[in-house]
Amino acid sequence: MTNFVRGHLIPLRVRREGARCYNPAVNKDQVRAAVAGYQKQRITGETLVQSAVLVPLLCKEDELHVLLTERTLNVGFHKGQVCFPGGTTHPDDDSLLATALREAWEETAVRPEDVEVIGEIDDNVVRSTGYVITPFVGFIPYPYRFRASELETRDIFFVPLRVLMDPLRFYHQERVIGGHYYSGPVCDYDGHVIWGATGRILEHLVGLLTGVAKTPSH
């Protein structure tokens, strides 16, 4: 059996993954080393709306990828943009992590119990909406029965970390994207444009990973 997500056939046969998932950019042990002990920068403010996202990492074709989504045109903000699974807090959420895991389930059908949460990285503020985003980094299984939310998620796709860690592929640009002037980190990948808060969060993660990637992991 397979699951189809806009051009991706996802086999449902589960393969046992090794702890390392080696690739030329970085492996699982190095990701844990970079993120698990990181002392994050938290941003607070009375006028900011609390939100959280999951930064899902998975081992696909023997290298680490990050899962991203493309929003539908039916959502209230950031229509058609690339983002992580996530959203604003609900009264029933007992923590920001609960928010990130709930939203990941709603948008991609990744179950909370299937996420190995590694840690948090720096908060990020979206000035246009007044959101402050708390990113949680975690490993998820692959293959997996992903399911895109009809209301919120137009596409689910995967970007190799080696692409994001390549300064010729992911770098600061000044350009008009979606009718908006933007200056910041951008990556064009497989017809998708990764920018904005998503780009800034990935830029921060890449910065953490670049240091540990230079250190051999045993």
Q: How would you name each of these model-derived features?
A:
Residues 3-4, 9-12, 21-83, 88-144, ...:
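N-terminal leader/linker segments that precede catalytic domains of diphosphate-processing enzymes
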Residues 147:
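Short, conserved charged micro-motifs
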Residues 150-180:
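Amphipathic alpha-helical blocks and their helix-capping loop/short-beta junctions
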